[in-house]
Amino acid sequence: MKIPHIPVLLNEINQAFEKLNSGYFLDCTLGFGGHSESLLKDHPNLKLIACDQDKEALEFSKKRLHDFKDRTEFVLSNFSQILDQISHDKLNDLKGILADIGVSSYQLDNNKRGFNLHSDFLDMRMNQDAKISAFEIINNYTQEQLSDIFKKYGELNDGYFIAQKICQERQKNKIKSAKELYEIIGKTKQNHRSVSKATLVFQAIRIEVNQELKVLKNLLEKLEKIKLKNCILAIICFHSLEDRIVKNYFKKWAKNCICDERAFRCECGNNHSLGEIISKKAITPSKEEIMINSRSSCAKMRLFHFKNMEK
């Protein structure tokens, strides 16, 4: 079986969850099953709940993980909704959670998915049943809407002019492919950054298509409300917007005191911590991993340990 995607930070994931003995492990973003396969091999008593919104990836992983079918439950779902579909008993026995918030190599390399700068299509939907694709956004959003998402999700300082250029071109003919869009944007780089403006525009469009920041926040909000007991959460991000969200939530969860910073003394009880941050700094790929898989270079993993704390 040819594997179309190399899992990032695999050794670091195995190390983070090395003490798992039994219970359930939730892979919120199963993809092509690399992380889950490794964990199932190393932990024979572990049961897996495997979730992905990409039908192609889920079907592939069902075949890949066939040897573990008695310990694996597959769910077609966006990761922000998966917690609503797990029974109370399983949530109580949840010992590990992984969310790898990135586009797979298969999605990037598959021409029809339209994620690649040189693709003949303009799609970018991780869930192929979703109604809005990159085509609708590029051809139907107003100049102001496009400018806003380029600034907000691409952190582009000239998003207005890029949006203006796109709107001028689409008046002549609809923009039908990623490579057309790439040619319109051009190959110039954003000031003080190594990536091209086109890459940042594509990032912004992809985030808008899949509502990536919104679904990440939804997942984190739901995790905050669940009384997880002795459970390790690992989240892998690939750009600063997502990583910033995860970092801030982890800091919030680790706080015992939630009083206003201007308060002279603690009045909240000083017992609100959900657990602890396992590593203060984000875990990044080794030089050796980046040499083997250059796409891993942007990956950052943060770990949080939910303790047994009854509120």
How should each PLM-predicted stretch be described?
Residues 1-311:
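S-adenosyl-L-methionine-dependent methyltransferase catalytic core, i.e., the SAM/SAH-binding region
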